[in-house]
């Protein structure tokens, strides 16, 4: 499952997915409406505005479903 699909499927009220990279970084992607905010170890890295770009970011940062 792509990260964008996983976030879209969450029904808990907080639309976020957290995973750990092989290097030990804790990654988080949160859906804030028109964009996603991505974090590494609690620090914001930036905003991503499309599901395709989010999935590219996720693949580059070792996200696995």
Give the positions of each predicted feature:
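Short intrinsically disordered terminal tails
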Residues: 1-3, 61-65
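Acidic, low-complexity, intrinsically disordered interaction modules
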Residues: 12-59
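Short amphipathic alpha-helical segments that mediate assembly, nucleic-acid/protein binding
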Residues: 3-6, 54
């Amino acid at each position: 499952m792509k990260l964008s699909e996983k976030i879209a499927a969450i029904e808990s009220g907080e639309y976020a997915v957290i995973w750990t990279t092989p290097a030990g970084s804790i990654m988080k992607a949160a859906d804030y409406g028109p964009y996603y905010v991505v974090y590494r170890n609690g620090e914001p890295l930036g905003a991503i505005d499309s599901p395709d770009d989010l999935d590219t970011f996720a693949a580059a940062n070792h996200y696995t479903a």
